[in-house]
């Protein structure tokens, strides 16, 4: 399909923009039938070979907190202004998760929670929860700005959950039920504060609020509070560039406290994407283009740790993964001198993109956390759905027209203020959404359709005027619309989102078979106005002052062409040639050492030998294996005869954008080619955001 030039105000080199658009043209598949979208798999981190890929979820799951109860793991996270809130996910292997409940269905604390009286809670609502289990009861504590600390509790994580409020607000808190029966919460940023909660969790113990860890020790925000083998640990993240994760440790709450960095500079090869300048909420927006420099790498931050029954420890954290939102990753934890470092023994502080699954004692089927598609035939919405703010439950229905979601329009000046917009997290790295809309029940002034909720946002909608129907695409970046005439109010609407390029394209169809693009490419940007990633949304509102008609949606299908971290099979038993992505140099064996040589045609054919769990050895034609000696310094990557061991074994790491890394089991670091032709090393800590640091390779099959 011919792509139109993107229309938006942008500052930055034009070459980068052209590259981004060219990548989209190459990457974009065009699905032309609705039937092709049914039954497609959704993102799952499990690679099916004993390994997993980060992120665990390729959709927004921010401020995660995790607990283990027996052999079961539970996870919750921030939901801000969306309802229901505080999702509860369950797993038995830390990789395959499934949503089982929300802690609450609605949180209505005033007109701003309902998008009434010109007020909203975008970027607010409920956030940064602390998940705990104590004496048979599950607890979730979470702050709401201006409304204090919310406490939810249940005997069963599937609910029902009860709720009470503590008037004082404790932002970014973490709760510890201590061995002496006291209940403590740490909170705040920089200077970490601690306060004791009363026994029934209805208030704070007077006189107990104080600074626990002074700002001078360099702690951050988003604390996670633990007591492990008699010692107290607090894990936090430093806000700003590179956001390292810090850990404070003490033998007693009174101190003294020590602090070390346990995770730093791990971006998983992801750099900063599009960003709106300032906090403008009206067009035209000024959008800065991607900046893949190391100084703006998007590092893992804000998370905690959990122990498995086998004694392994694992870390969880989030990453500002551009417009798709803040994503959760899983990290092996290595204890050194009583400190829980994220990463492997030879590469402390750095999380592998692909690694072997945790030893939890359970082998689970490959599972996605949500059923994203919905045919609206059931008595309830799929659990993936969340309303934008508190809905008016009298203005939507699954029963008025069985098999359809019916949205009755309410007055709103624009989509931002439209009540009863039904949303779900957009999913990466790439997805297409299709819905069938019957707009015969719309009234003049109604507009109903499919949107990308973000700031700026965009939508494709059917409009009812005094003289009939039209279809319109609105791009808030520019504030411009593109219109087309339609002969029927029965349409199929689609949006394709590529979160690698951060470009979306809307299209529509009169028959559900052939789709026509409408409008230019829409730039999806990461922003802090909503403090969430992009969300798909179904909506219906009236541009007048009174309620209008109704819109009926027949289905909502999500298609993900790249639902696995291993984007293509490892070429086991095939010979490949490797080329450095940075400069096009080939890898070749010269004088018994692996070297980078100019000219792709000079590369050595290396046979990929399966070593299990996604690990491989690289065999030369004469039966020798690429081997890492010593610390993997330049010149220590050679070829050796004999049966391959750890020195000859590499984790095959697919970075999901066509490039591959090789993680040495001997050094826990990556093979890296020098900038100029020369000997190769295996001492690189991890990929740079621009993928041009010599650790990223492309491979092709070659004759043996």
Q: PLM features: residue spans?
A:
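Carbohydrate-active catalytic/glycan-binding domains of CAZyme proteins
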Residues: 3, 36-570, 605, 647-651
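N-terminal secretory signal peptides that target proteins for export/translocation
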Residues: 1-15
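Residues marking helix boundaries in flexible regions
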Residues: 26-27, 57, 571, 577
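Sec/Tat signal peptide C-region and signal peptidase I cleavage site
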Residues: 31-34
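Lectin-like carbohydrate-binding module/patch detector with strong preference for beta-trefoil
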Residues: 567-704
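Bacterial N-terminal signal peptides
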Residues: 19-29
